[in-house]
Structure formats: structure tokens, C-alpha cells
């Protein structure tokens, strides 16, 4: 439980502190999502419920698809602008 909280807080801090780099923001979102998945997995193992484990596998698959789509959008963004940095005005 404490490990998942620490991982989630690391993800939030990474997202907040790296507001100019889209890749690091995407990685931070993935860390937060995997922390929640790990919490669901550990909780389902503690109560001996297979439904939580299958739900964790489902979350991991969706996170992989999300990462692939996000990186594809980033490649298109890089080709268009030449950089993946966000410029605030």
C-alpha cells in the first residue's frame, strides 16, 4: 500500500514538475496508472479474488495501447514542429 502511494506521488510530481516535456508527462501518467494497477493487484491477492487480477491485466493492456497511441501522436507532433517541448505563452 505504501509503495503504491509513493509511486503515485512520484507520478504526480513528475507530471507537475515536467510541464514542458510531453514525453516525461506521458511517462508520469503511465507511472500513476501502473501504481493504481499494482494496488488493485495486491488487494485482489490479499482477498483471494481472481476478478481483481483480470482487471489488472485489462488495465495493463489498455495502458499499453494508450502509450502506443500517445507516442504515435508525439512522432507526428515532432515531425510537424521539430520539437516535443511545450511552449506556454
From Swiss-Prot:
Q: How does it sit in the membrane?
A: Multi-pass membrane protein
**Keywords assigned by UniProt, alphabetized:** Electron transport, Membrane, Mitochondrion, NAD, Respiratory chain, Translocase, Transmembrane, Transmembrane helix, Transport, Ubiquinone
Top-level taxon:
Eukaryota
Q: Where in the cell is it found?
A: Mitochondrion membrane
Primary localisation category: mitochondrion
Coiled-coil positions? none
Enzyme Commission number, as recorded: 7.1.1.2
UniProt cross-references to Pfam families, sorted A to Z: Oxidored_q2
GO biological process assignments: ATP synthesis coupled electron transport
Reactions accelerated catalytically = a ubiquinone + NADH + 5 H(+)(in) = a ubiquinol + NAD(+) + 4 H(+)(out)
Keyword Transport found: yes
Q: Name one GO molecular function term.
A: NADH dehydrogenase (ubiquinone) activity
Cross-referenced InterPro entries, in alphabetical order? NADH_UbQ_OxRdtase_chain4L/K (IPR001133), NUOK/Mnh_C1-like (IPR039428)
Gene Ontology CC annotations of this record: mitochondrial membrane; NADH dehydrogenase complex
- On whether Manganese is a keyword of this UniProt record, the answer is no
State which residue ranges cross the membrane. 1-21, 22-42, 57-77
Q: Which family does it belong to?
A: Belongs to the complex I subunit 4L family.
PANTHER family named among the record's database cross-references: NADH-UBIQUINONE OXIDOREDUCTASE CHAIN 4L, NADH-UBIQUINONE OXIDOREDUCTASE SUBUNIT ND4L
Q: What does this protein do?
A: Core subunit of the mitochondrial membrane respiratory chain NADH dehydrogenase (Complex I) that is believed to belong to the minimal assembly required for catalysis. Complex I functions in the transfer of electrons from NADH to the respiratory chain. The immediate electron acceptor for the enzyme is believed to be ubiquinone.
Name assigned to this protein: NADH-ubiquinone oxidoreductase chain 4L
Native organism: Cryphonectria parasitica
Organismal lineage:
Eukaryota, Fungi, Dikarya, Ascomycota, Pezizomycotina
Gene that specifies this protein: ND4L
Amino acid at each position: 500500500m505504501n509503495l503504491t502511494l509513493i509511486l503515485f506521488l512520484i507520478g504526480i510530481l513528475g507530471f507537475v514538475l515536467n510541464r514542458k516535456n510531453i514525453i516525461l508527462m506521458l511517462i508520469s501518467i503511465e507511472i500513476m496508472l501502473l501504481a493504481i494497477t499494482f494496488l488493485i493487484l495486491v488487494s485482489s491477492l490479499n482477498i483471494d479474488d481472481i476478478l481483481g487480477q483480470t482487471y489488472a491485466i485489462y488495465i495493463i493492456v489498455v495502458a499499453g495501447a494508450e502509450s502506443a497511441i500517445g507516442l504515435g501522436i508525439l512522432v507526428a507532433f515532432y515531425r510537424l514542429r521539430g520539437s516535443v517541448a511545450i511552449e506556454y505563452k
